């Protein structure tokens, strides 16, 4: 967790104190190609490039230029996708980002300014990623959009139908630094499948399963 698109623009971090640097998308693609056969992409594989939310989370702690961050993130994703295509990839999937305003972190510890900035970043990113999918199109190459924003909104609105009873709270509570600072005691619910979110930011296994089903149904 904690990875961003490009650490030169926004450094991704992990750990309780968010002090452990983690590899970005650029590094991950580079390492994959370095170890791949003949340092080329597998033409039979599906390459899913999914990043962007952490650029906002970590970037907004040091800068208010959120739209520039969104532009830089999508430019990086587009560059890495093109690199894979140029080296033999035939099927590439880019993803939109979900509404961070729905996460327990923003619901319980955010404010109107944070929500407004998050929404502006999300709209800009998702607009740009759709344009990137169009720009990357080539004959005999499949470049597709997995619209995680749309899928997650659909799941949120129909949560009860999927057996999800709790959408605003985290299944696992009190384990983050933010929660500790707010006096939240450590607690794990008995049935995480009834929750939309596992922790302050990440969906539960059940929510991930529903997202995967939506991607498969929409694209494959």
PLM regions with names:
Residues 1, 45-50, 55-58, 85, ...:
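Structural recognition of the beta-strand scaffold that forms the well-ordered cores
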Residues 1-75, 79:
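Conserved SGNH/GDSL esterase-like catalytic core that processes O-acyl groups on lipids
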Residues 24-28, 73-80, 85, 118-121, ...:
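Stable alpha-helical elements in mature extracytoplasmic
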Residues 38-43, 47, 86-87, 138, ...:
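Extracellular/periplasmic catalytic domains that process cell-envelope and extracellular macromolecules
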Residues 39-40, 80-91, 124-145:
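A structural motif corresponding to the C-terminal end of an alpha-helix
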Residues 99-119, 123, 131, 135, ...:
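Mobile gating loops/cap/lid regions near enzyme active sites that modulate substrate access
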Residues 204:
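Short, conserved phosphate/pyrophosphate- and ester-handling motifs at nucleotide-, phospho-/glycolipid
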Residues 214-219:
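C-terminal alpha-helix
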